[in-house]
């Protein structure tokens, strides 16, 4: 299993269809693949005898607790999420799921997709709808000026392009 993920506070309960599919795939992987593997390893370690000083047994039990915690979180989160896949009535405004191309005062461009907090992925330019930038962008039209207040200070952006993925 990857690194430990502490429980998060629930953000906006929106998610794209792709994000929901990733969470369901993670849940399936944990419950049907990883948990049986770790359970088998714990059973084999327990069969070796003394459990008090059995590092494999102790580590396996810890892994089971982490897997079970993540499974509980995913099940509960998936129940409460609203999948938003349809295009908005006004595609010339920024809403959830939009790819937005921005340009700053120096002419440098950046492109972001507004997604749910469970899908946040800065390497792929996917920002949470709860972020200061996304909150400032939602509802803006093409060519709008957007002043974004972040912990690093204020920055002025211009909305250059708004694009929505095709509906599933």
From Swiss-Prot:
Any one GO biological process: regulation of DNA-templated transcription elongation
GO molecular function: DNA binding; RNA polymerase binding
Coiled coil regions in record: 61-84
Superkingdom of this protein's organism: Bacteria
InterPro entries: GreA/GreB_C_sf, TF_GreA/GreB_CS, Tscrpt_elong_fac_GreA/B, Tscrpt_elong_fac_GreA/B_C, Tscrpt_elong_fac_GreA/B_fam, Tscrpt_elong_fac_GreA/B_N, Tscrpt_elong_fac_GreA/B_N_sf, Tscrpt_elong_fac_GreB
Cysteines paired by S-S bonds: none
SUPFAM superfamilies: FKBP-like, GreA transcript cleavage protein, N-terminal domain
The entry's keywords: Coiled coil, DNA-binding, Transcription, Transcription regulation
The keyword Hydrolase belongs to this UniProt entry's keyword annotation: no
Family indicated by similarity: Belongs to the GreA/GreB family. GreB subfamily.
Its job: Necessary for efficient RNA polymerase transcription elongation past template-encoded arresting sites. The arresting sites in DNA have the property of trapping a certain fraction of elongating RNA polymerases that pass through, resulting in locked ternary complexes. Cleavage of the nascent transcript by cleavage factors such as GreA or GreB allows the resumption of elongation from the new 3'terminus. GreB releases sequences of up to 9 nucleotides in length.
NCBIfam families: greB, PRK01885.1
Protein name: Transcription elongation factor GreB
Organism (species): Pseudomonas aeruginosa (strain ATCC 15692 / DSM 22644 / CIP 104116 / JCM 14847 / LMG 12228 / 1C / PRS 101 / PAO1)
Species lineage: Bacteria, Pseudomonadati, Pseudomonadota, Gammaproteobacteria, Pseudomonadales
